[in-house]
Amino acid sequence: MAKLLSCVLGPRLYKIYRERDSERAPSSVPGTPTSVTNPHSSSWDTYYQPRALEKHADSILALASVFWSISYYSSPFAFFYLYRKGYLSLSKVVPFSHYAGTLLLLLAGVACLRGIGRWTNPQYRQFITILEATHRNHSAENKRQLANYNFDFRSWPVDFHWEEPSSRKESRGGPSRRGVALLRPEPLHRGTADTFLNRVKKLPCQITSYLVAHTLGRRMLYPGSVYLLQKALMPVLLQGQARLVEECHGRRAKLLACDGNEIDTMFVDRRGTAEPQGQKLVICCEGNAGFYEVGCVSTPLEAGYSVLGWNHPGFAGSTGVPFPQNEANAMDVVVQFAIHRLGFQPEDIILYAWSIGGFTATWAAMSYPDISAVILDASFDDLVPLALKVMPDSWRGLVTRTVRQHLNLNNAEQLCRYQGPVLLIRRTRDEIITTTVPEDIMSNRGNDLLLKFLQHRYPRVMAEEGLRVVRQWLEASSQLEEASIYSRWEVEEDWCLSVLRSYQAEHGPEFPWSVGEDMSADGRRQLALFLAQKHLNNFEATHCTPLPAQNFQMPWHL
């Protein structure tokens, strides 16, 4: 009877993975058939085959879930319509509640029938036995057996806790349950006294900004967190998950962040290979509709690196909602997991981000200054210009205030706090992070990210002449035109390197540098072009084109 109840309340099972020969071992869970511990020895297909009763019940419950999601998103309009028609009176609501209660009882009955279907299936019974054993005892053998199954991630046991590192338990400088530290935006109106009256005057605007951010704004910024999109992508995500586990020998793990969100991760270990880059770990930060199952992790994987992918809060197996604070909290526990559980030193970790993932990557670079390098692909300096691009001009004040208070993705500001090597990859036909049209390459916000970065590190070089010539170089529409500008100013790379190395030897590596202070205008132009060319690579593609492995290069450093 207890097993039947477990089948009724248990998670949905999607797939049973093929085990590698090296991982086959006798089961430590009593009553485990050999056909489950060694899937190759059975006739079962690796995709879980539910019995008819479970299959049809699952379809009904999935349909109900979709209808509930549609009802949730359309509820404001529905309530407004019902109110206008007078259907929200007590005489109308009571019968409706009876109908709703009856429907819930019917769905509960369907869930019980699904449980009976699972109970009659030896595959599911064995899975639930292993899952319960793993929750009771987190032994390596139980976890190894559980990793052979792909199921609803909400039931996966937590593998790593944000407080697990001993240094955090002893130190007060780490994150609290309120979250890790973020850079806060400056007040919109400097010098204004923050009196009680002023706060009352601002209250309507603040309430409006909050409502916009938590309804329309967050879903526009992170469409991957919308349930209906995830439901549509589920087959693709399951296929990507299977590829990472079966072909790349990936290991899935659940991390618990300081805000209570559970973060879904996938680790592919290449340290046992002969390739030297396998000793380096690339932590991948996905875009606003990207998932590690089908995202940018494929690029460093093809290049031979060890890779750690993770999903934003609210994406696929990760819980929560993707606001900046939650994003940073998630990134923090991912980095801690890489260092304290996977055993990588910060000097062996590379941050690779695509698009909006630049926020979490630059936050981690700022917060963990010993990290080896940062690679930002198709990223931007600040969210405000991109948000203004897609909203009406009359909403400018509301959009700016909402972004600054609730969705402040200040990539450039965070990147300037990092001292290590950085490479920016600019998509020359990017249709997402341009503020006009893709053909107008100067409206690409990757340009602004580069300029702010160079102006922070080399303020004397990037003054007037240097800034002007770098803008000309960024405006070039082809590699030939870039080379023409580079040769027009007769950039001597050996001279540039000697100037930078001599300055570093005399003053140390800490940025910003005052190099170029006593230099001629021509010297500053040469140095500015040299530095821009070393920190930015062009990729002839649109925003969503996967980056080829040959374009995944380590950043330049002295």
Curated annotation (Swiss-Prot):
Enzyme Commission number: 3.1.-.-, 3.1.1.23
Classification via SUPFAM superfamilies: alpha/beta-Hydrolases
GO BP annotations listed: monoacylglycerol catabolic process; phosphatidylserine catabolic process
GO cellular component terms, semicolon-separated: membrane
Keyword Lipid metabolism: yes
All residue ranges annotated as the AB hydrolase-1 domain in the record: 281-407
Residues annotated as transmembrane: 60-80, 93-113
Keywords: Hydrolase, Lipid metabolism, Membrane, Transmembrane, Transmembrane helix
Superkingdom assignment: Eukaryota
Pfam families tied to this protein: ABHD16_N, Abhydrolase_1
Molecular function per GO: monoacylglycerol lipase activity; phospholipase activity
Main location (coarse class): membrane
Membrane topology: Multi-pass membrane protein
InterPro entries named among the record's database cross-references: AB_hydrolase_1, AB_hydrolase_fold, ABHD16_N
Active-site residue list: S355, D430, H507
Reaction it catalyzes: 1-heptadecanoyl-2-(5Z,8Z,11Z,14Z-eicosatetraenoyl)-sn-glycero-3-phosphoserine + H2O = 1-heptadecanoyl-sn-glycero-3-phosphoserine + (5Z,8Z,11Z,14Z)-eicosatetraenoate + H(+); 1-hexadecanoyl-2-(9Z-octadecenoyl)-sn-glycero-3-phospho-L-serine + H2O = 1-hexadecanoyl-sn-glycero-3-phospho-L-serine + (9Z)-octadecenoate + H(+); 1-octadecanoyl-2-(9Z,12Z-octadecadienoyl)-sn-glycero-3-phosphoserine + H2O = 1-octadecanoyl-sn-glycero-3-phosphoserine + (9Z,12Z)-octadecadienoate + H(+); 1-heptadecanoyl-2-(5Z,8Z,11Z,14Z-eicosatetraenoyl)-sn-glycero-3-phosphocholine + H2O = 1-heptadecanoyl-sn-glycero-3-phosphocholine + (5Z,8Z,11Z,14Z)-eicosatetraenoate + H(+)
Cytoplasmic side stretches: 114-558
Protein's cellular compartments: Membrane
Keyword Membrane: yes
Function summary: Phosphatidylserine (PS) lipase that mediates the hydrolysis of phosphatidylserine to generate lysophosphatidylserine (LPS). LPS constitutes a class of signaling lipids that regulates immunological and neurological processes. Has no activity towards diacylglycerol, triacylglycerol or lysophosphatidylserine lipase. Also has monoacylglycerol lipase activity, with preference for 1-(9Z,12Z-octadecadienoyl)-glycerol (1-LG) and 2-glyceryl-15-deoxy-Delta(12,14)-prostaglandin J2 (15d-PGJ(2)-G).
PANTHER family for this protein: ALPHA/BETA HYDROLASE DOMAIN-CONTAINING PROTEIN (PTHR12277), PHOSPHATIDYLSERINE LIPASE ABHD16A (PTHR12277:SF54)
Family according to the record: Belongs to the AB hydrolase superfamily. ABHD16 family.
UniProt name for this protein: Phosphatidylserine lipase ABHD16A
